[in-house]
């Protein structure tokens, strides 16, 4: 009597950033067992409801998918896999990933800007800008953000995201085609 094991359990989201998920994203667990198993029972995000389990090429390869909805809480995607081999031997329930893969974090919270400041390098005052001056907009968000689209004086600005992705800076150099402005 040999108990089955799960040699591979990985997780990913169909989000652009596969370690993140928001409402509407599909989270997929990939499961590879040591031998053929019956259809495993998989709970994700606190329930088996809404989880679709599909056999792959054979009964040792499985995927389990679930779509994130507004009712799911933010946080790391918890899961539980129970399974048995074809002979009925139960394997130990699995609740963690193999191989150090990234977990999927559900994040449905809209980021907000907590601080924003704008200044120029004008020698008469950082609130003024004339052609040739550089205007810098610094933004601090409440969580990591992707590169925002920023316009300064109605023109596209160059954006720099810092290593702590909650902080970014946007820079624009006033051209001679623009009037003096107060920023």
Q: Where is each model-derived feature located?
A:
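Short, flexible domain-boundary/linker segments around small modular repeats
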Residues: 9-13, 118-120
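Flexible, low-complexity linkers/stalks enriched in Thr/Pro that connect modular domains
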Residues: 1-9, 96-114
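Extracellular beta-sheet repeat scaffolds used for adhesion and glycan interaction
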Residues: 14-18, 23-25, 39-80, 84-87, ...
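Short proline/glycine-enriched turn/loop motifs at strand-loop junctions of beta-rich domains
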Residues: 32-39, 140-147
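A broad structural signal for short, well-ordered beta-strand segments within beta-sheet-rich domains
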Residues: 6, 36-37, 94, 113, ...
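Structural beta-strand segments of beta-rich domains
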Residues: 25-29, 133-137
């Amino acid at each position: 009597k040999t108990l089955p094991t799960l040699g591979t359990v990985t997780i990913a989201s169909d989000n652009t950033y596969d370690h993140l998920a928001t409402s509407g994203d599909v989270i997929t667990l990939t499961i590879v067992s040591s031998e053929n198993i019956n259809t495993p029972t998989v709970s994700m995000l606190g329930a088996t409801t809404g989880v679709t389990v599909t056999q792959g090429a054979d009964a040792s390869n499985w995927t389990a998918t679930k779509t994130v909805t507004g009712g799911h809480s933010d946080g790391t995607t918890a899961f539980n896999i129970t399974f048995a081999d074809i002979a009925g031997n139960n394997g130990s329930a699995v609740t963690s990933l193999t191989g150090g893969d990234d977990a999927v974090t559900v994040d449905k919270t809209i980021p907000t800007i907590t601080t924003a400041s704008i200044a120029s390098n004008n020698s008469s005052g950082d609130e003024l800008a004339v052609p040739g001056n550089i205007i810098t907009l610094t933004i601090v968000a409440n969580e990591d953000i992707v590169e925002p689209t920023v316009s300064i004086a109605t023109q596209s600005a160059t954006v720099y995201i810092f290593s702590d992705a909650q902080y970014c800076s946007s820079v624009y150099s006033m051209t001679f085609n623009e009037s003096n402005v107060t920023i």
